[in-house]
């Protein structure tokens, strides 16, 4: 498995600033660090009595989710509101798309209503890239998750969580455990960790839930024995089993998966004593993680949600700024 081809010029303006946020593939380390630093500065906003800054005042953010979501959609809404933007969240099940209107026509109509940023989640890999390149290139397009391909804001909020608790990435061992085959979060995390200089990225899963070619594509170490893979790691990122994307025969049973790969208190002892426990949600307790671990002292799962708002504020504000700068450059060139 190789990542979708990096489209660096598509994501960045002529000055190298973010204008769309579609994937972490091909983005330079300096830009990922800038996103993390910007998000760090926005965490203070969440502690204020009035949780608002005027960076997107007068702008409209459209959340267009073709897949169900709670955390991602809600945190994007909060992020946009804290930046003082107007927010529209499209309920696809009751929208014109359910009456036969194409994705292309739906988005072009929203663009005609003077939207400035689209946050799009779609079941098809590459949907956000297609929209940014062929449908609405003059708007800032943010990928809220596309098929198995990418979930870049989740990847970045996970990196912010790790950095705030562990500091630099250069001496860390990070294990990603679970359904790697169907996980866009795993792909974004592997890319982010590699770009930020993490020297030891471990992927732990049954062989039936491992894509082919992970080692070559992402520079990771692959383990099919959880006990071996978790030894002395600094961070454990658990992933749920995505039954809705599976075909029959990939797993004998959820009980068997929990026995061999579930993160229990006993299995967590194989990691370093201060290892972080992370999970992008939704959590399936007793399937990939024990409740005592999910709610335990090493868990930073709720911190991930908090940091997600700050990361999405950073991405929204940076993409809008980069898109505005490109428009100005285009106008100057036209004159």
Curated annotation (Swiss-Prot):
Mention one GO biological process in which this protein takes part, according to its record.
Answer: amino acid metabolic process
Pathway terms, separated by semicolons: Pyrimidine metabolism; UMP biosynthesis via de novo pathway; (S)-dihydroorotate from bicarbonate: step 2/3
Picking any one GO molecular function of the record gives:
amino acid binding
- Where does the chain bind L-aspartate? 99, 184, 240
| Catalytic activity, as annotated | carbamoyl phosphate + L-aspartate = N-carbamoyl-L-aspartate + phosphate + H(+)
Pfam hit, one: OTCace_N
Q: Which InterPro entries match?
A: Asp/Orn_carbamoyltranf_P-bd, Asp/Orn_carbamoylTrfase, Asp/Orn_carbamoylTrfase_sf, Asp_carbamoyltransf, Asp_carbamoyltransf_Asp/Orn-bd
Q: What class of enzyme is it?
A: transferase
Give the EC number(s) listed in the UniProt record: 2.1.3.2
One Gene Ontology term, aspect cellular component: cytosol
The entry marks the following residues as binding carbamoyl phosphate, namely 71-72, 121, 151, 154, 281-282
Subunit field text: Heterododecamer (2C3:3R2) of six catalytic PyrB chains organized as two trimers (C3), and six regulatory PyrI chains organized as three dimers (R2).
Enumerate the HAMAP family for this protein. Answer: Asp_carb_tr
Name assigned to this protein: Aspartate carbamoyltransferase catalytic subunit
Q: Which organism is it from?
A: Ectopseudomonas mendocina (strain ymp)
